[in-house]
Amino acid sequence: MLTFFAAFLAAPLALAESPYLVRVDAARPLRPLLPFWRSTGFCPPLPHDQADQYDLSWDQQLNLAYIGAVPHSGIEQVRIHWLLDLITARKSPGQGLMYNFTHLDAFLDLLMENQLLPGFELMGSPSGYFTDFDDKQQVFEWKDLVSLLARRYIGRYGLTHVSKWNFETWNEPDHHDFDNVSMTTQGFLNYYDACSEGLRIASPTLKLGGPGDSFHPLPRSPMCWSLLGHCANGTNFFTGEVGVRLDYISLHKKGAGSSIAILEQEMAVVEQVQQLFPEFKDTPIYNDEADPLVGWSLPQPWRADVTYAALVVKVIAQHQNLLFANSSSSMRYVLLSNDNAFLSYHPYPFSQRTLTARFQVNNTHPPHVQLLRKPVLTVMGLMALLDGEQLWAEVSKAGAVLDSNHTVGVLASTHHPEGSAAAWSTTVLIYTSDDTHAHPNHSIPVTLRLRGVPPGLDLVYIVLYLDNQLSSPYSAWQHMGQPVFPSAEQFRRMRMVEDPVAEAPRPFPARGRLTLHRKLPVPSLLLVHVCTRPLKPPGQVSRLRALPLTHGQLILVWSDERVGSKCLWTYEIQFSQKGEEYAPINRRPSTFNLFVFSPDTAVVSGSYRVRALDYWARPGPFSDPVTYLDVPAS
């Protein structure tokens, strides 16, 4: 494959098509680049009163480990439906309503373990107790439940942590998916006031938004528009005051297969909101289900590979380049979430709207589960290298400048760490995407010209690259004949192509200019990361733990929160059978904070330790070791 990649790097420009020119000026920062895209979500299946069986399943525990392992907090939030169905309720004589939070505690602990925040929808009815929010007693009891819940988790995790949570209303109220709860429009407003006051009692720093729905033009979406009217000038159920707080407005606009359609719909909704309710012109806007296509379980080939990854990047770039860069826009856009943390199922391991591909391997004793990292999850790690300030960048073809609604696009950023010019970095991410369409037999010539890079200590750059030939477990699976129960060797081969193809660090050219010529398939992603050498080597890897897969296989997961540097080449993983002499495990360069160890020998019992290596081959300190005792063969 390295020979193939070398040939790819040296490929001459196609004569049949004029090249796309991507110009980036590292000396021209334009505006802050805030990572508004670091969110995902999922919904447990019916029946929702058994949500614990899905949310706390081993499969979901593995899934959340993968999501939490995106480098540099590349995904921070998981937005979950029906959380309150993880609580049970009973009414006892003389004691009133009693709640059991055991399952919800366990699930939130699981998020904490993976350094993830909940997008906390106040959705569900504990043990089916709440049935009617036009019933004033139930409205008061709901306020008490919300207050109890918030105070519980402030006590458990601390106010600093819980104040980061996005509490939100019941999902999509105009879709009337309330299970057995009667929810009129007035009942929904009563419910909202109870959520607001319950949270406020716990702490005024807790934020609440909604309604998390489509906001179709009036007279459609009556609950959406009624909530805005109520928060603007309605009467608070509890205080009698005019108006109720609305800390953010959440809406759902998906793309119907089109990237630009998401932004166009958002802009239309927000324009109508601001016309009808000018008091909300500064209220943060969340699109917390901004998927390119509705229907998470609908199998689509493009959801399986780099097509989906490049499309997600394109949507984000359109928001940054067409919305944040638009000085005439008054929209305060804060969050874009893809609702793609579901678990895929047979016979569609790759092609549903998921971040991982799940294989339920039932031909082992006992049966076990394997997950593979799809490119759409891998690319969130590339996106995490974009931070600091957005740089001036331009795409043109034959002299005509192209906006982000074209096949080739770019996002570029520069990072100036406080107090240490020695750790300056610049990131350029180029995508080729025709939305949901792949063109396997067509490549386009692209020239990158990066200028304005200041001189720095040991200045180097790396190149990372993804396409459907070199970086697609789905393509590998297809070439194997789509086995239902892949063997250990087949899983190893698929995992060989989970990461981008990485071109080793090389010195940045003198005079602060770099020119690269590439032939890029559609879809593909090309990232260039330029760094000066930090004064110190990487910090220590922390939170190392081992999770069992099956006999002779395990997962190692760790945290990069103390590593500090983003100029990382790989993590070195060492193994010792006796816990004395360690030897490195041979693997491809990867900065993903998770590794599946599945050696030919099937010998995995022993001790493990991990350390980061930066672009200058400097190691950080080893993590504390973790010891693993293998699952016995049966």
From Swiss-Prot:
<dbReference type="InterPro" id="IPR017853">
    <property type="entry name" value="Glycoside_hydrolase_SF"/>
</dbReference>
<feature type="active site" description="Proton donor">
    <location>
        <position position="172"/>
    </location>
</feature>
<dbReference type="GO" id="GO:0048878">
    <property type="term" value="P:chemical homeostasis"/>
</dbReference>
<feature type="binding site">
    <location>
        <position position="44"/>
    </location>
    <ligand>
        <name>alpha-D-mannopyranose</name>
    </ligand>
</feature>
<dbReference type="GO" id="GO:0030211">
    <property type="term" value="P:heparin proteoglycan catabolic process"/>
</dbReference>
<feature type="binding site">
    <location>
        <position position="81"/>
    </location>
    <ligand>
        <name>alpha-L-iduronate</name>
    </ligand>
</feature>
<dbReference type="Pfam" id="PF01229">
    <property type="entry name" value="Glyco_hydro_39"/>
</dbReference>
<dbReference type="GO" id="GO:0003940">
    <property type="term" value="F:L-iduronidase activity"/>
</dbReference>
<dbReference type="GO" id="GO:1990079">
    <property type="term" value="P:cartilage homeostasis"/>
</dbReference>
<dbReference type="InterPro" id="IPR013783">
    <property type="entry name" value="Ig-like_fold"/>
</dbReference>
<dbReference type="GO" id="GO:0035108">
    <property type="term" value="P:limb morphogenesis"/>
</dbReference>
<feature type="active site" description="Nucleophile">
    <location>
        <position position="289"/>
    </location>
</feature>
<dbReference type="GO" id="GO:0120158">
    <property type="term" value="P:positive regulation of collagen catabolic process"/>
</dbReference>
<feature type="binding site">
    <location>
        <position position="353"/>
    </location>
    <ligand>
        <name>alpha-L-iduronate</name>
    </ligand>
</feature>
<feature type="binding site">
    <location>
        <position position="339"/>
    </location>
    <ligand>
        <name>alpha-L-iduronate</name>
    </ligand>
</feature>
<dbReference type="GO" id="GO:0005764">
    <property type="term" value="C:lysosome"/>
</dbReference>
<dbReference type="GO" id="GO:0007613">
    <property type="term" value="P:memory"/>
</dbReference>
<feature type="binding site">
    <location>
        <position position="46"/>
    </location>
    <ligand>
        <name>alpha-D-mannopyranose</name>
    </ligand>
</feature>
<dbReference type="GO" id="GO:0007628">
    <property type="term" value="P:adult walking behavior"/>
</dbReference>
<dbReference type="GO" id="GO:0005615">
    <property type="term" value="C:extracellular space"/>
</dbReference>
<dbReference type="InterPro" id="IPR049166">
    <property type="entry name" value="GH39_cat"/>
</dbReference>
<protein>
    <recommendedName>
        <fullName>Alpha-L-iduronidase</fullName>
        <ecNumber>3.2.1.76</ecNumber>
    </recommendedName>
</protein>
<dbReference type="GO" id="GO:0045780">
    <property type="term" value="P:positive regulation of bone resorption"/>
</dbReference>
<dbReference type="GO" id="GO:0030209">
    <property type="term" value="P:dermatan sulfate proteoglycan catabolic process"/>
</dbReference>
<feature type="glycosylation site" description="N-linked (GlcNAc...) asparagine">
    <location>
        <position position="100"/>
    </location>
</feature>
<keyword id="KW-1015">Disulfide bond</keyword>
<dbReference type="GO" id="GO:0043202">
    <property type="term" value="C:lysosomal lumen"/>
</dbReference>
<dbReference type="InterPro" id="IPR051923">
    <property type="entry name" value="Glycosyl_Hydrolase_39"/>
</dbReference>
<feature type="glycosylation site" description="N-linked (GlcNAc...) asparagine">
    <location>
        <position position="233"/>
    </location>
</feature>
<dbReference type="GO" id="GO:0061037">
    <property type="term" value="P:negative regulation of cartilage development"/>
</dbReference>
<feature type="binding site">
    <location>
        <position position="254"/>
    </location>
    <ligand>
        <name>alpha-L-iduronate</name>
    </ligand>
</feature>
<comment type="subunit">
    <text>Monomer.</text>
</comment>
<dbReference type="GO" id="GO:0005975">
    <property type="term" value="P:carbohydrate metabolic process"/>
</dbReference>
<dbReference type="InterPro" id="IPR000514">
    <property type="entry name" value="Glyco_hydro_39"/>
</dbReference>
<feature type="binding site">
    <location>
        <position position="48"/>
    </location>
    <ligand>
        <name>alpha-D-mannopyranose</name>
    </ligand>
</feature>
<dbReference type="GO" id="GO:0060348">
    <property type="term" value="P:bone development"/>
</dbReference>
<dbReference type="GO" id="GO:0048705">
    <property type="term" value="P:skeletal system morphogenesis"/>
</dbReference>
<feature type="disulfide bond">
    <location>
        <begin position="531"/>
        <end position="567"/>
    </location>
</feature>
<feature type="binding site">
    <location>
        <position position="171"/>
    </location>
    <ligand>
        <name>alpha-L-iduronate</name>
    </ligand>
</feature>
<dbReference type="InterPro" id="IPR049167">
    <property type="entry name" value="GH39_C"/>
</dbReference>
<dbReference type="GO" id="GO:0006027">
    <property type="term" value="P:glycosaminoglycan catabolic process"/>
</dbReference>
<dbReference type="GO" id="GO:0090341">
    <property type="term" value="P:negative regulation of secretion of lysosomal enzymes"/>
</dbReference>
